[in-house]
């Protein structure tokens, strides 16, 4: 009996132990679950989250500027992209470099359409002008800093500045051609010059000035030369009439006003006529065009002494005269003929 009582007395103790043990185990499991949840929350807090104001490949300098750089995935090297005034400009520079390296697979700060990516790859200078289609915020554009647009994107001005009309040549440039002296084997196209559209407003004044200047530089035509042989002015008192012959060949041009001019040909210009060159007589005719024409009879009273001396000289004397003989005191004192070293003479 005693044994049975002792056994019955021991049973509730065992059950209590078992209950207590179960309770302890249950408490330990709950404690383990609470510890795991708390540690998981701590780990989540420690993980770095993307800040809303930061961009990929952009760092802020202590003095306020933003630096952009990118890492090449093939060579594992960092490429410096430059420093910018704002973070948006640096982010745009990073996106341009990333798209050029990786194409559409690149991670960018902004979202781009395929057309934008193609435009950036073909012309990187236009990258700052592209607006992100999925973001209406205009702050992504570097519109607040025009210095960036000028320094890093030189083509910005070509697309946004109004095109100025091309300047035409001023109308006062071409009249300088009227002061050119005639060159042999070269015809002067005065008619084309007078009909140019740039000189349509000043044709009247230019034609008059051209007539006066060309009358000085050019000689007469062959017909007018034959008519003026008898009224040659001062040349009758110095040169015999047989020497005053028209040039064999001449090229004529006409201007807008209708006046004709001749350009002497160099083939026979150097052939002497009795010691005198052909250019001497042409220069004499050019000088007499701007003066009044006087006949030889009008000057007969002035050249009586020289006419007697010229009549006594024969044709052979003129043919044998040297250019040095013409610079004698009797002729040089008249003040019209000056001898050159080359044998050509000019009248002042």
Curated annotation (Swiss-Prot):
Family as reported in the entry's similarity comment: Belongs to the AP2/ERF transcription factor family. ERF subfamily.
DNA-binding region boundaries: 54-111
GO BP terms: bract development; ethylene-activated signaling pathway; floral meristem determinacy; floral meristem growth; flower development; lateral root morphogenesis; negative regulation of lateral root development
UniProt superkingdom: Eukaryota
Function: Probably acts as a transcriptional activator. May be involved in the regulation of gene expression by stress factors and by components of stress signal transduction pathways. Involved in the control of cell division patterns during the early lateral root primordium development. Acts downstream of auxin signaling. Regulated by ARF7 and ARF19 in response to auxin. Co-acts with LBD16 and LBD18 to control lateral root development. Involved in the determination of floral meristem identity and suppression of bract growth. Required for proper conversion of secondary inflorescences to flowers.
Pfam families recorded: AP2 (PF00847)
Segments of this protein annotated with the region Disordered: 29-53
Record keywords: Activator, DNA-binding, Ethylene signaling pathway, Nucleus, Transcription, Transcription regulation
Gene Ontology molecular-function annotations: DNA-binding transcription factor activity; transcription cis-regulatory region binding
Disruption phenotype: Disturbed cell division patterns in lateral root primordia leading to the expansion of the proximal region of lateral roots. Short lateral roots in young seedlings. In the shoot, formation of small pin-shaped protrusions at the base of pedicels.
Localization: Nucleus
Induction description: By auxin.
Gene: ERF086
InterPro entries: AP2/ERF_dom, AP2/ERF_dom_sf, DNA-bd_dom_sf
Cellular component GO terms held in the UniProt record: nucleus
The protein, known as: Ethylene-responsive transcription factor ERF086
